[in-house]
Amino acid sequence: MKLRPLHDRVIVKRVENETKTASGIVIPDSAAEKPDQGEVLAVGPGKKNDKGEISPMAVKVGDRVLFGKYSGQTVKVAGDELLVMKEDDLFAVVEK
């Protein structure tokens, strides 16, 4: 199934955090926090401004982004847990 977000929404798949600390301590699943990074899988066309023109999105498919731990709405698609959120919920794009 392919999703096409509407307006200024993006679809993000969470990227799992490391399960081991820098000193080698393994973090159990029960203590692990929700990841706050993800990969953009799809982007909407953009948000309409006051003049009715569509403002282009600042992110593109494949970008790695930072967001709040509780941002977006979780949806399950073909067994994958994805997030649908507004572009405004994104904090930054991780540059390589």
Swiss-Prot record:
InterPro entries: Chaperonin_GroES, Chaperonin_GroES_sf, Chaprnonin_Cpn10_CS, GroES-like_sf. Its main location: cytoplasm. GO terms for molecular function: ATP binding; metal ion binding; protein folding chaperone; protein-folding chaperone binding; unfolded protein binding. It is found in: Cytoplasm. GO terms for cellular component: cytoplasm. GO terms for biological process: chaperone cofactor-dependent protein refolding. Pfam families: Cpn10. Signal peptide: none annotated. Keywords: Chaperone, Cytoplasm. CDD domains: cpn10. The keyword Calcium does not apply. Together with the chaperonin GroEL, plays an essential role in assisting protein folding. The GroEL-GroES system forms a nano-cage that allows encapsulation of the non-native substrate proteins and provides a physical environment optimized to promote and accelerate protein folding. GroES binds to the apical surface of the GroEL ring, thereby capping the opening of the GroEL channel. Heptamer of 7 subunits arranged in a ring. Interacts with the chaperonin GroEL. Belongs to the GroES chaperonin family. This is Co-chaperonin GroES.
